[in-house]
Amino acid sequence: MSQAAVETNNMPSINVAPVLSLIEKNAPEGKENRQLPDSSIEALREQGFFRMLLPKKYGGYECTPQEFFRSAIDIAERDMSTAWAGGIIAVHAYQLAIMPPQAAEEVYADTPDTLISSSYNPAGAKVKTVDGGFELSGRWGWSSGSGHCSWTLLGGVITDHPDGIHYRTFLLPRSDYEIEETWFPMGLHATGSNDIVIDEPVFVPEHRTHIQMDGFNCVHHQENPMYSIPWAQLFIRVVSSPSIGAAKH
């Protein structure tokens, strides 16, 4: 267990306070380079921030959402971009926990500190149903923190499936996609929210997909009832927490 994790009533407590001064110090560098400094990511990783919502069986801490959001707000008081990109990366551990177990087993096979980005907008996605899974290509915008991540979650609408038209999230390793530098914003400069591009279709097996309605209906594969919270409720709060922290600054 990280030195930042302390057992409280058999539940770990993550303390991000020791890295807040570094995050604040790094803010100008992140703004200039339009992505979070490596040292900020590594500091959050060492404090266990990215493992807060990850199941214990994969090396995580299974912290409560309340504790996770409090940490995100504390970070945002020092730098909103770090809370935005870092929080989005961290919350994906929860989505992996409610996907088919084989997906998490692959992602966290080598380390529980694997980082995952996302872009859920399906507008630029092309999806084809094939034997055992799907072929995916297209372009997805605003993938915050993607330059620090070795996996990504991408949204797509399936129109040729026996179950009818529906939305899924597709989990892909870094070798399956490119990151195109498109992030030249007026705010949240350091989030590095660049485009994810897949020019030639890549295969995504069925177990590395997440049906949207499963997330809404609280379908999960964990013993902890915390994972019954609908996925969307976690995500909308992780992107609103930075505003609360910034307002407190």
Named regions from a protein language model:
Residues 115-118, 185-189:
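Short Gly/Pro-enriched turn/cap motifs at secondary-structure boundaries
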Residues 36-46, 51-149:
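Glycine-rich flavin
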